[in-house]
Amino acid sequence: MGFSLASTIPSFIFSSCKQKLKDLNLKISLQAYSFAPLLMSGKFDIMDFPEIVRNTYGLNGAEYWSIAFMNKEKDKNFISELNKKSEDLGISNTIILVDDINIQTMEQGPSLASLKKEERTKAIEYHKHWIEVASKINCHSIRVNLKSDVGSEEDILETSGESISKLAEYGSSYGVSTIVENHGGLTGNAKWLVKLIKDINSDFVGTLPDFGNNGFCMKRERLDLSNLTKPCDQQYDKYEGVKELLPFAKGISAKSHEFDDKGNDINTDFEKMINIIKESSYEGYIAIEYEGGMLNLFGGKGNYLAPHEGVIATKTLLEKLI
């Protein structure tokens, strides 16, 4: 995967390319979803990801996206080679974000939160597969989504709890946790999500707090990749939301979109977010998850950087604050 740097890239991007961590308990990792537009145009190969993380960005934490495997995870030799590459480069593989969605048609698979038992059973089996994949590349967790267009909060709490409990039990034998991200809908309500985690009460269940506005959007026309740029009808306070989810966090997504001329994300006060994290008991990786490229791909109206430049901008911002 090759990158070319345009002459128009803002100068702030290059002001700090060496990782300087003020807090040794917090580290920076990179989420493969940052390169989703390149994946969709055939310019990103997940096999190259460990090398990109290490040699292009000087990081040692890799966070994966299930879609980027392009079904190659079913090949034992492929997975073995990916794991060996990671180990040889000194990369810590952390989390796989699991999505069951056709990126051509945007059709989504069965939901773990469905009110239909048959649908939940299919979703559970799908995610068990990814628990096995995660264990083979030494990731500690898979991230799941809980989407449901029907049912009360109580109904979805019950069905989600049942599904995740089964995944937690299955994952315990692999040393792999099941974690839930605030990904819109009911999961955008941090209090609801905290109740879910507490009700399940398992060491193999947790949260993945996400900085993004979309993640804390509790009500919108439809929640999927194709409506990333649509307005939210009911927004949860994301700073309070992150604070509420942190006690159960097994990872953090530093979602970024667009930057001003000083290098700050214009949608999220990163300094405020990082201070909230520092005041918590969280230790571990904060993942760069640049989404500006995807917003641009789906018609967003903004001054979005290309994936590589967006990752560098997010990395620079995090390094300044951690």
Predicted features and spans:
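Conserved, mostly hydrophobic/aromatic
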Residues: 30, 53, 86, 123, ...
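Glycine-rich, proline-tolerant flexible connector loops at the mouths of alpha/beta enzymes
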Residues: 61-84, 146-152
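Catalytic domains of carbohydrate-active enzymes, especially glycoside hydrolases
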Residues: 45-65, 137-138
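Hydrophobic faces of well-ordered beta-strands that scaffold small-molecule active sites
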Residues: 26-33, 60-64, 93-98, 142-144, ...
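C-terminal segment of N-terminal export signals and the immediately downstream linker at the start
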Residues: 11-33, 38-41
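Active-site acidic/histidine proton-transfer and metal-coordination neighborhood
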Residues: 4-12, 20, 51, 85-209, ...
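Acidic/histidine-rich catalytic cores of soluble enzymes
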Residues: 61-62, 161-275
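Active-site beta-loop-alpha junctions enriched in small/polar residues
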Residues: 33-35, 65-69, 98-101, 147-149, ...
